[in-house]
Regions:
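Conserved functional hotspot residues or short segments at active or partner-binding sites
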Residues: 108
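Helix-terminus loop motifs that line ligand-binding clefts
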Residues: 11-85, 91, 97-102, 111, ...
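Short beta-alpha connecting loops at secondary-structure transitions
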Residues: 134-145, 316-328
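Acidic/histidine-rich catalytic neighborhood
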Residues: 114-183
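Short coil/turn linking the two alpha-helices of tandem helical-hairpin repeats
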Residues: 91-92, 300
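Terminal accessory carbohydrate-recognition/targeting modules of carbohydrate-active enzymes
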Residues: 301, 344-376
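Acidic/polar loop patches that form or flank catalytic/metal-binding clefts of enzymes
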Residues: 12-17, 28-31, 162-174, 304, ...
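Active-site core of glycosidic bond-cleaving carbohydrate-active enzymes
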Residues: 1-26, 76, 80-85, 102, ...
């Protein structure tokens, strides 16, 4: 959703980030509540003084009949790095130094402090690890070293270190003093660097597959044919606790990492992971089809990309009728300019967007898509 604002209405993107900045005091309270430094932004946020508003329970469990416990508010902490990354992308696209000096630098430093204090040292492995989390895939709870979470945390800490170095090189001593007074991060540079250098970052195994978390690749398989092709909802047959014991994804996780940071791994690794995780993903989140669609487009899988794009575009138009409770605005990412620079994928006129924007350059993109209604 943020991308669609950033590359069509950057002032709207600025307001979204400004809202997050106004919630920073509550985010610092939440981090302290869990014994951490810095700031931990809420998974679900409302008014700026509300803090975390994620409910602790949901609908009745299909197996037990009891309310489903909801752990996202305490475990889906990758939102912290996601917000920091959004700040980075905003500055990268707009060169809005005033915003960074007023809000952005502070947000990135505070979130970096959280990650550095959240990581736990494993003496046997000689590395820092992040335990008890939910990555983007919400059918995997209480996991350790989720790839998306750890790589984004690593980026967050390293970006904070890069900011401190740039400001020092630019002679911004007054700004550094102000940031130290607000965050205490300037004097913790060596401490943060140690965490960044030793944080566990899951690597591809012998097959080239990046472990979604420490347990995922060792879990048994589940035949997903009835759910991927038969139209059945997996939560009508299993509860989330059961699904945590299988190689089943609710939504893009490793593929989300590869979509957000495609330069982390070579294309052959991206392809292997796309194929592996697409086969195990039931796309029960409206935010999943679009991520897989963009990744397939980057890989030159034109028909696959367009098939998934149509599914994403039809979330509020096809069966299910869940849009009565609100439309799925996050799918705007699939229709927006995804960074600047365009790579045309030849084949059926499909176009995807790729690249890194130059500072100060914005694109307004108007995409007209004709979806044909075909007779069955």
């Amino acid at each position: 959703l943020f991308s669609s604002w950033l590359y069509t209405e950057p002032e709207g993107a600025r307001r979204l980030l400004r809202y997050r900045y106004l919630t920073l005091p509550k985010a610092k309270e939440k981090a302290a509540q869990y014994g951490c430094e810095g700031a931990l932004f809420p998974w679900e946020s409302a008014w700026i003084t509300d803090g975390e508003v994620t409910p602790s329970e949901g609908a009745p469990d299909v197996v037990t009949g009891k309310p489903i416990p909801i752990y996202t508010g305490t475990q889906e902490i990758h939102v912290n790095a996601d917000i920091a990354y959004a700040v980075h992308r905003y500055f990268e696209a707009t060169d809005d130094t005033a915003f960074m000096e007023e809000c952005g630098y502070e947000m990135i430093l505070e979130t970096a402090l959280y990650w550095a204090s959240r990581a736990e040292w494993n003496e046997e492995r000689k590395q820092y690890e992040i335990h008890g989390v939910i990555g983007p895939d919400e059918y995997s709870e209480h996991v350790s070293n989720n790839a998306y979470t750890n790589y984004m945390a690593s980026w967050n800490i390293n970006e904070a270190l890069r900011i401190l170095e740039r400001l020092l090189q630019a002679g911004k001593t007054d700004l550094l003093e102000a940031l130290e007074e607000k965050t205490g991060a300037v004097s913790r540079e060596v401490w943060m660097k140690d965490r960044a250098e030793k944080l566990a970052l899951p690597k591809p195994d012998g097959r080239g597959i990046i472990p979604q978390d420490e347990a995922f690749l060792n879990l048994p398989e589940l035949d997903l044919t009835p759910f991927k092709k038969g139209g059945r909802k997996i939560l009508e047959s299993f509860n989330v606790e059961q699904l945590c014991g299988y190689q089943v994804l609710k939504q893009a996780d490793v593929v989300m990492l590869l979509s957000s940071m495609p330069d982390l791994f070579p294309e052959d690794i991206i392809l292997k992971n796309y194929q592996y995780y697409e086969a195990r993903c039931v796309h029960d989140s409206s935010l999943s089809f679009n991520v897989h669609s963009m990744t397939a487009a980057r890989l030159g899988m034109t028909e696959e990309s367009f098939r998934l794009f149509r599914k994403a575009a039809g979330v509020d138009l096809n069966g299910g009728l869940s849009s009565a409770e609100g439309i799925h605005g996050g799918n705007g990412r699939n229709l927006a300019v995804y960074r600047s620079g365009v790579r045309r994928i030849i084949g059926k006129g499909w176009v995807s967007c790729d690249g890194t924007p130059s500072a100060g350059i914005l694109a307004k993109c108007f995409i007209f898509i004709r979806l044909e209604r075909r007779k069955v």
